[in-house]
């Protein structure tokens, strides 16, 4: 499966910018680049930079900075050269065209990362993390992906694998030498229990990992016509929600992604809570209640010009903040409650800065102790770990029931293969192709 040709691609996004990078990797990377670069590329030491001119067909294309990384001390494990040229479309595209005309092949999406995987520089978990780092649209998603790329998830899988191998060795002694004195079965039982604890911890992190990667959900709730939609617009600086003086205007869930200090938040505007005979509005209210139940926090909006309303019980079951909107029209009353309260005006902007500070502190408190934890965010990883758990549970039950060792060994081998499906050592070409095809060209 390892390819021996030399590939090239533009590694930076298209469009205007100060610099662009053209990357080339493979056994002929140095020789091909030498044909278009003004210096003697074969004489350059690894991990050095050289200023020069790219020429092709008697035409000077651009002045570039050449970085050379000789195999195996490179990202792909092959000879790699990066040419840093002026930004924009034409310089990098002309350099790529020159490299291809001299023998390089245009790289496929993710092919540089795929070569790094095939050459043992990274495992499949780390390769997938590269794409997640690139695609991250908030800090939580970025740091989860960085955690995977740094190998923390892979180390857990390696530990699980070693525990399974140790258990399997004991079981295979039973199968191969049934007449001999039997080893102590407490050892494989203990090793399987240790592996199961790690697997359960990883599986249980999936929902939280998804939430962190996709963003914290905060619901704007309250009675009709208190300014929930106006607040959504004020926080996001968009006219996203329809604002009228007619109660019950919002009848469905309206969600808007919002980034606050690098943290992604899913702000959810919901239907006003009241008694109504309108079936459509009733459905909206039911959806609002469901959204509050599933959210990580609630902003309960109230009208400062109206008497204090009763508070629903759900506000005391999860992080909640009481907001007295329209404080530009009246001084808000103070409710006798343990919940924090804040006066704001979605119309004038009063209190919005303080509200953002409160939400930021809120999220920092939720984040405590999570930075070093490995979170699952991939459905592929989650599914394989569930399969692994099933195999190990069957093996444990087989040990307790004293089933034939061959049957127990079969379950352990399947669990061991599942660890290979995660790391990539047991993955076929079709799956690898599907995974790396999601990458951008040049990575």
UniProtKB/Swiss-Prot annotation:
Binding site for K(+): 225, 244, 246, 249
Binding locations of (6S)-5-formyl-5,6,7,8-tetrahydrofolate: 23, 82, 121, 443
GO biological process: tRNA methylation; tRNA wobble uridine modification
Binding site for Mg(2+): 229, 250
Cofactor entry: K(+)
Keyword Nucleotide-binding set for record: yes
Domain TrmE-type G as annotated: residue spans: 215-364
Record keywords, A-Z: Cytoplasm, GTP-binding, Hydrolase, Magnesium, Metal-binding, Nucleotide-binding, Potassium, tRNA processing
Binding annotation for GTP: 225-230, 244-250, 269-272
Entry-linked NCBIfam families: mnmE_trmE_thdF, small_GTP
Protein family (similarity comment): Belongs to the TRAFAC class TrmE-Era-EngA-EngB-Septin-like GTPase superfamily. TrmE GTPase family.
HAMAP family cross-referenced by the UniProt entry: GTPase_MnmE
UniProt-recorded name of the protein: tRNA modification GTPase MnmE
Source taxonomy: Bacteria, Pseudomonadati, Chlamydiota, Chlamydiia, Chlamydiales
Gene it is expressed from: mnmE
